[in-house]
A protein has these predicted regions:
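A nucleotide- and high-energy phosphate-metabolite-utilizing enzyme signature
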Residues: 1-474
Length: 474
């Protein structure tokens, strides 16, 4: 089938010529892979679904390292192989001599995204181009992670920088388009407050965008001033809908991100957009403990000039209010027990939800931020930084070790998301993928990694229990 044009990728004479020259080196590379039979089978499946082969075969002929990486992806990272099927040209970025140096640099990433989006001729093309560059850059960041070129922490920062840049550019485009019909609300300022992994710069390739839209109107305007004016609350609700659609709507180029807006006041039952004063009132009078926990790492990810500082000041004021230690800790312990019952881990490596996993580390850090914010002195900091600081000031003596464990858990979860479309289905867990996990976590073997992770989970559980007992008396 390969040599007789049985696949679309090999129908062109030029493709078959390249493949003939490539084949000896390709077979040798596959033979060296962890599971040669599986790697060959996956490469054949990959080839059968590839729409065109000329460009890719030419690249693989002339770049040994690229050929080795692609075979490695076949064996250990089927999600990455799938991306190559849909956009074979993403491999071009891997042969750039500057790739290893540039893949972890935010300024380079932002520059590439901005330059690509600047060529959009209209609004819809901008929406499509955001998806194209987003998927390409996600692939390159994931490749940097899985090849060991960058750490899990760096990958999280780059996935987040990509998401923020795309969200910022799309928000500008959405507002320009929206204002053509509805004008602006005089005296209004708008900002996006990010939560979760986006806020802490720990996004993975599969992360949602977790944010809410907050606005403020000075001067008392009640309506927008466009051809089709809208009441202020309706204006910002519609604007939010347009932004969410720009990010989540499927186009011919796919979906950019899923959006999670459950942390807006009153959750999914509340308005899509909220005024700053209403946000503060809700947080101070009606919010649950879990909402305050989430607020401890919230971060403004986009805002009109001067408005970010207002939102940040409001968040600081909310979190500076005294919290009853007993009630806070009781609520945290109850929430964790309910989560264990309603959202049990789906796999032994579901390191977010397993007892002693990421959730427990986050609950320790976030509850400490509620009860000892000034003493910690790291407002809105990511979990690992808070944990390390808790060790420094003696509130959680094991803090430095917990921060280290957080790094290991994050590395495993980043790699799982980058390599596997469904990390919790066993068929993706090939020997090659297991070996990759061990390599990325500096473990001698996968068996040793699994054993060490179990020990780490026990350490986290014990440290969390001691913290909760101590925190009751703060």
């Amino acid at each position: 089938k390969w040599h007789y044009g049985g696949y679309a990728a090999t129908r062109a004479a030029a493709a078959r010529a390249h493949l003939t020259e490539l084949l000896p080196a390709l077979l040798l590379t596959i033979a060296k892979a962890g599971n040669a039979d599986l790697s060959f089978s996956r490469f054949d499946n990959f080839l059968s679904r590839l729409p065109s082969g000329v460009q890719l075969f030419a690249l693989l002929r002339t770049h040994d390292d690229l050929r080795e990486l692609l075979v490695q992806l076949m064996a250990s990272a089927p999600r990455m192989a799938e991306a190559v099927i849909h956009r074979a040209h993403v491999m071009d970025g891997l042969i750039d001599p500057a790739f290893a140096d540039e893949v972890s640099r935010r300024t380079v990433l932002v520059g590439k995204v901005d330059a690509f989006l600047a060529d959009a001729r209209d609004y819809q093309e901008g929406i499509d181009r955001a998806r194209i560059i987003g998927q390409e850059q996600q692939f390159l960041i994931a490749a940097g992670l899985l090849s060991g070129t960058m750490s899990a922490r760096q990958a999280g920062e780059q996935f987040t920088a990509l998401a923020e840049t795309l969200l910022h550019r799309l928000f500008i485009a959405v507002r320009v388009e929206f204002e053509k019909r509805h004008g602006v609300v005089p005296g209004a300022s708008v900002g996006l407050l990010g939560f979760g992994k986006m806020a802490s710069r720990e996004m993975t390739v599969a992360s949602d965008l977790d944010f809410i839209l907050i606005y403020e109107v000075e001067g008392g305007a009640e309506d927008s001033n466009g051809e089709k004016p809208l009441a202020t609350s309706q204006y910002f609700a519609r604007l939010t809908q347009r932004l969410v659609a720009a990010v989540t709507a499927p186009t011919s180029e796919g979906v950019l991100y899923q959006a999670d807006m459950r942390l807006r006041p009153s959750g999914n039952a509340g308005p899509l957009a909220t005024s700053l004063s209403a946000f503060q009132r809700y947080q101070e009078e009606s919010a649950w403990t879990w909402e305050h926990l989430a607020l401890t790492r919230a971060r403004v990810v986009d805002a009109d000039e001067g408005f970010a500082a207002k939102i940040e000041g409001t968040v600081a004021a909310i979190l500076s209010r005294p919290s009853a230690a007993g009630k806070t800790i009781d609520d945290v312990v109850s929430m964790r027990a309910l989560m264990a019952k309603e959202r049990p881990p789906r796999h032994p490596f579901d390191l977010k939800l397993v007892p002693g996993g990421l959730i427990d580390l986050e609950f320790v850090a976030q509850s400490a931020q509620l009860l000892a914010r000034e003493q910690i002195g790291r407002p809105q900091a990511p979990t690992a930084i808070v944990l390390a600081r808790l060790g420094e000031i003696g509130l959680v003596p094991e803090g430095a070790r917990l921060a280290e464990i957080h790094g290991v858990f994050s590395t495993v979860l980043q790699a799982m998301s980058a390599a596997l479309a469904d990390p919790f289905k066993d068929e993706g867990w090939t020997d090659a993928f297991r070996d990759l996990l061990a390599q990325l976590t500096n473990e001698p073997s996968f068996t040793r990694l699994a054993e060490d992770l179990k020990e780490m989970q026990g350490e986290v559980q014990s440290a969390a229990e001691r913290w909760y007992a101590r925190a009751q008396e703060l």
